[in-house]
Regions:
Chain A
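An anion/pyrophosphate-binding glycine-rich loop and adjacent beta-alpha core
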Residues: 229-337, 405, 446
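Conserved N-terminal glycine-rich FAD pyrophosphate-binding loop of Rossmann-like flavoproteins
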Residues: 40-72, 76, 249-253
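Glycine- and aromatic-enriched mobile tails/lids
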Residues: 2, 18, 26, 30, ...
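Glycine-rich loop(s) and the adjacent beta-strand/alpha-helix scaffold that form part
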Residues: 195-249, 382, 388-405
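Conserved redox-cofactor binding core of oxidoreductases
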Residues: 94, 101-186, 193-195, 199, ...
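Core beta-strand elements of the Rossmann-like FAD/NAD(P) dinucleotide-binding domain
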Residues: 6-9, 184-195, 365-369
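N-terminal Rossmann-like FAD-binding beta1-loop-alpha1 element of flavoenzymes
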Residues: 10-36
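Short beta-strand to alpha-helix junction loop
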Residues: 79-92, 125-143, 153, 210-218, ...
């Protein structure tokens, strides 16, 4: 598998979903020679699955300040104000930018873009294109990438980052990535002169019932983690209340936004009748609705002990066809239900990772030259619970900021600090088993951290890249050599324990059990082997590499969930049914310290540009 | 057979071929050993029948790998999968791969008909595997790669030609004029959005191109997906007349709209129900109008 090829660009963007494409366009506008490296062809990215819409305060009567207020409240006061304010201030401009690029938004009579209500918003500010907003956004942006002639290396799986070796991660810098060309099996270095932007999307495959694509294995998060970048607030996973029971395919919040109603097995409109959200009912925020549904099912008022009904028939065929047509197709194709004639079965499913790679408001991580944007990142705009329609603006706003920053444009000093410095606080955390990789024994070497394994400090960028490439070549050789456990077995063991123990409802005992199961899965991964010997399109190998990422992420997620002994947003803890602002107005951060995960905290920033967001009780 | 297996065609292909001159390397030997082991496992799986008594479906799956001895000669493998209500062709393939043969290769990602990566030839028709219910198909289910495309491995085809044709129609929005205020929309009427709406739904799956007889015979024909993309912009009122004329010129070229013989096969297979043939006809009409204006 010898290869000497190195590709060189100013800025390398990893991932071609909404975040990656926007970042690439921005970097190019700022004058950089930019390339996108993506394991899927851009139009196959999961952004295409987004349905509901993009929040942007673009109408009279609305303001970005109100949007920021709603977002902070929705986050259960775990968002950082500088990031939230950037999101809400920039979203109108970025949304209209999409319109200027031709995006096929739904329209009002006067030709302006339509908006609709979404859960947790005080104004109907969700801009949309039918129930296929993500598809329209992804394609529109890819078109602009084609127009600009930005180079795309598609079906190249990025395996690792080329990061220098200093002891303290905040002293490290990133000089590129190592890619694996799926078609040919070639491993090559991608040298980034100015910066690497990770935009690898979600990590839904950690769970078995998810709205996410099969490719959403959290690769970027895991790579950054192993290179020493902290992961922030990993315990906050959004479970969407309306997914189809058999597949996890999402039924957009747009259905409830348009007036869809939830019923339990007894035909009761339970959101009101059982007092879960007396004001907002079905439009309460997602965590509230997901818990309500499961409570109904657990208390015997579900249907077939599994799901509840979402009814949109009363909206009438015209309105459904106009605004929710795609939902009819999804219900029909994937559940065999005609939404015009029958209510649709729905249950909660993993949907979105609020946590991820720790960044500041410009997408910078604590490693110099390394950025992260989109769902893989945590600039801390969603805190403990993301509002529907707030992820797509995140892609375009932070995609643009990171692209410009990486290309060398001047910015003000960031207000959000990254890395283990400043006012952090060490955690007192006890795990039931040894975590991380150490216990795996001597072989652990082969799947070691980026360039950060404590050897002699190499600082020459080309040499750093070369070391990283060699390490991946060796890893692939070894994986192909060994004829061991199939990755699919390990992956499903992880998914099972996560679904059983780290789901919507969580308790200490189950979380500990999950860590024990994950330890076992990690040990089995030591014996993983790839049985397909081919260099052509070896998906066996790819899935094996992804499974390693799933393992690391699942562990960090569970650690965070065990440590945070309070009830906030999407994170429900049986032992502690209150939001504990006194002790927990802080982010959990987990960093990989030479193979050992290390947990610590940092206070939330509630101080905005002109005001402080005072935590209030969140009621809907 | 309807599928084309590459015979070491283009240069890039050749570059990735193992060097025949060299001594068999450690890697080659290893690969050989692996192939043997894989064959062994396959034999074992075929002998034991863990699914006896269950409601099963039989898949006949096309196999080919230019790298692996024993798979260089295309063939069909049989897999038996337990059937559950609601199971799709993609679910069945995943089951077969994860349970019997981890080298079974196909593209897939969203499993909800939006990423367009799993178009295949199933029981004689182009379909998205994730959107096709097993219960709608007769047994055995025959699964092949998209016809009229080069096969890379098993069910994976080379999409480059499809992407190139897409590129050829300048597939991006080019507004006539933009509002000066960056917070103001350029606006589009509801009626115009309706006109282009269906055309914007394309997920680039390639099913239409693969089903088209004309495209099969004429490699340069732009094909239904690219023409649909051209329609999407040519009919968008925001682009303005002169850009529209340029777009019509592109699709009027020798291998453009006039090649379409309205056989409707593209329209039949499109998983997004895009009225492709109609869009192509509409473009022909526009082209005629355009010419009348000038000649
Ligand atoms: C079904 C669904 C509906 C949603 N609806 C909405 C909505 O209505 N409104 C809203 O605001 N949000 C919505 N969301 C959330 C939002 O769509 C996602 O958070 C967002 O699209 C993620 O975009 P991204 O660019 O970060 O990642 P993605 O679009 O997932 O892109 C990830 C990219 O990274 C690449 N990649 C991954 N790993 C590697 C690797 N190792 N090497 C190279 N490339 C790699 C992939 O190829 C891909 O191109 C929805 C999410 C889902 C799942
Ligand atoms: S037009 Fe239809 S069949 Fe053709 S590529 Fe697009 S979605 Fe697929
Ligand atoms: S898997 Fe995405 S279209 Fe079928």
């Amino acid at each position: 598998m010898a290869s000497n090829t190195t590709y060189e660009h100013d800025v390398i963007v990893v991932g071609a979903g909404g975040a990656g494409l926007r970042a690439a366009i921005a970097a190019q506008e700022a004058g950089a020679d930019v390339a996108i490296v993506s394991k899927l062809h851009p139009v196959r990215s999961h952004t295409g699955a987004a349905e509901g819409g993009i929040n942007a305060a673009i109408r009279d009567g609305d303001s970005w300040e109100d949007h920021a207020y709603d977002t902070m409240k929705g986050s259960d006061y775990l968002g950082d104000a500088p990031a939230i304010e950037a999101l809400c201030r920039e979203s109108p401009k970025e949304t209209i930018q999409l319109e200027h690029w031709g995006m096929a938004f739904s329209r009002e009579e006067d030709g302006t873009v339509s908006q609709r209500p979404f859960g947790g918003l005080s104004f109907p500010r969700t801009t949309y294109a039918g129930a296929e907003t993500g598809h329209q956004l992804l394609h529109t942006m890819y078109e602009q990438v084609v127009k600009r002639g930005i180079e795309v290396y598609d079906e190249w799986h990025v395996m690792n980052l080329a990061v220098t070796d200093e002891d303290d991660p905040t002293d490290r810098s990133c000089h590129g990535v190592v890619g694996y060309e799926i078609r040919s099996g070639e491993i090559a270095g991608f040298r980034a002169r100015d910066g690497v932007i990770l935009a690898t999307g979600g990590m839904g495959q950690v769970f078995d019932h998810t709205t996410n694509a099969v490719a959403n294995t959290g690769d970027g998060v895991a790579m950054a983690y192993r290179a020493g970048v902290p992961m922030e607030d990993m315990e906050f996973i959004q479970f969407h209340p309306t997914t189809l029971p058999s597949t996890g395919v999402l039924i957009s919040e747009g259905v409830r936004g348009e007036g869809g109603i939830l019923y339990n097995g007894e035909g009761e409109r339970f959101m009101f009748e059982h007092g879960y959200a007396n004001n907002d009912g079905e439009l309460a925020s997602r965590d509230v609705v997901a818990r309500a549904e499961l409570t109904e099912v657990n208390e015997g008022r579900g249907i077939e002990d599994e799901y509840v009904h979402l009814d949109m028939r009363h909206l009438g065929e015209d309105r459904i066809l106009d605004r929710l047509e795609n939902i009819l197709h999804l219900a029909e194709d994937f559940e065999g239900v005609d939404g015009l004639e029958e209510p649709m079965p729905v249950k909660p499913g993993q949907h979105y990772a609020m946590g991820g790679i720790e960044t500041n408001e410009y997408g910078q991580t604590c490693v110099d030259g390394l950025y992260a944007v989109g769902e893989c990142a945590c600039a801390s705009v969603h805190g403990a619970n993301r509002l529907g329609g707030n992820a797509l603006p995140e892609l375009i706003v932070f995609g643009k900021l990171a692209g410009h920053h990486a290309a060398g444009e001047e910015f003000e000093e960031p207000e959000i600090e990254t890395g283990k410095r400043g006012d952090y606080e060490d955690a007192d955390f006890e795990a039931p088993v040894t975590l991380g990789e150490r216990a795996a024994g001597a072989d652990a070497e082969s799947t070691a951290d980026a360039a950060a394994d404590g050897g002699e400090a190499v600082t020459d960028p080309d040499a750093v890249l070369e070391i990283a490439v060699d390490r991946e070549v060796a890893q692939v050789e070894e994986l192909l050599e060994g004829d061991g456990v199939n990755h699919a077995e390990i992956r499903s063991a992880v998914q099972e324990t996560m679904t059983a123990n780290v789901n919507v409802f969580r308790e200490e005992e189950g979380l500990k059990e999950a860590l024990v199961d994950l330890r076992e899965a990690r040990d089995r991964y030591d014996d993983v082997g790839v049985s397909d010997p081919s260099r052509t399109f070896n998906t066996d190998l790819l899935h094996t590499l992804e499974t390693r990422n799933i393992l690391d992420i699942a562990e960090a997620l569970t650690m965070g969930a065990l440590a945070r002994n309070e009830f906030r947003g999407a994170h429900w803890r049986k032992e502690n049914q209150i939001r504990d602002d006194e002790n927990w107005l802080k982010h959990t951060l987990i960093s990989w310290n030479d193979g050992d995960p290390d947990l610590w905290y940092r206070p939330v920033i509630l101080e905005g540009e002109n005001k402080r967001y005072e935590p209030k009780v969140r009621s809907y | 057979m309807s599928t084309q297996v590459p015979q070491q065609t283009d240069e890039t292909d050749a570059e990735t071929e193992p060097d025949a001159e060299e001594e068999p390397s450690k890697g080659d030997l290893r690969r050989e050993k692996k192939a043997e082991r894989a064959a062994e496992r396959e034999r074992e799986a075929a002998e034991a029948d863990p699914l006896a008594g269950e409601d099963t479906r039989e898949l006949k799956v096309f196999r080919f790998d230019p790298e692996v001895e024993g798979k260089q000669e295309p063939r069909f493998d049989e897999f038996h999968v337990p059937f559950e209500k609601g199971m799709t062709v993609l679910d069945a393939l995943i089951y077969a791969r994860d349970t019997y043969d981890s080298s079974l290769t196909f593209r897939h990602s969203c499993r909800q008909a939006v990423c367009g990566s799993d178009a295949m030839f199933v029981n004689g028709q182009q379909r998205l595997a994730c959107k096709t219910q097993l219960s709608d198909l007769s047994d055995p289910v025959r699964i092949e790669p998209l016809p009229h495309a080069d096969v890379r491995k098993d069910l994976v085809v080379d999409m480059q030609h499809f992407y190139d044709q897409m590129d050829a129609v300048e597939p991006y929005f080019d507004a006539d004029e933009l509002p000066e205020d960056e917070l103001e929309e350029q606006r589009q009427s509801r009626a115009n959005r309706e006109t282009v709406k269906m055309s914007t739904r394309c997920i680039w799956c390639g099913a239409c191109m693969s089903s088209c007889n004309i495209a099969a015979g004429d490699n340069q024909y732009l094909g239904p997906a690219a023409l649909n993309k051209a329609y999407r912009f040519a009919m968008d009122e925001r682009e303005g007349e002169s850009r529209k004329r340029e777009r019509l010129e592109i699709i009027e070229q020798e291998h453009g709209v006039w090649r379409c013989q309205t056989q409707f096969s593209c329209t039949e297979v499109c998983p997004k129900d895009i009225p492709l043939t109609e869009h192509i006809q509409e473009l022909k009409r526009e082209a005629v109008k355009n010419n009348l204006k000038f000649w």
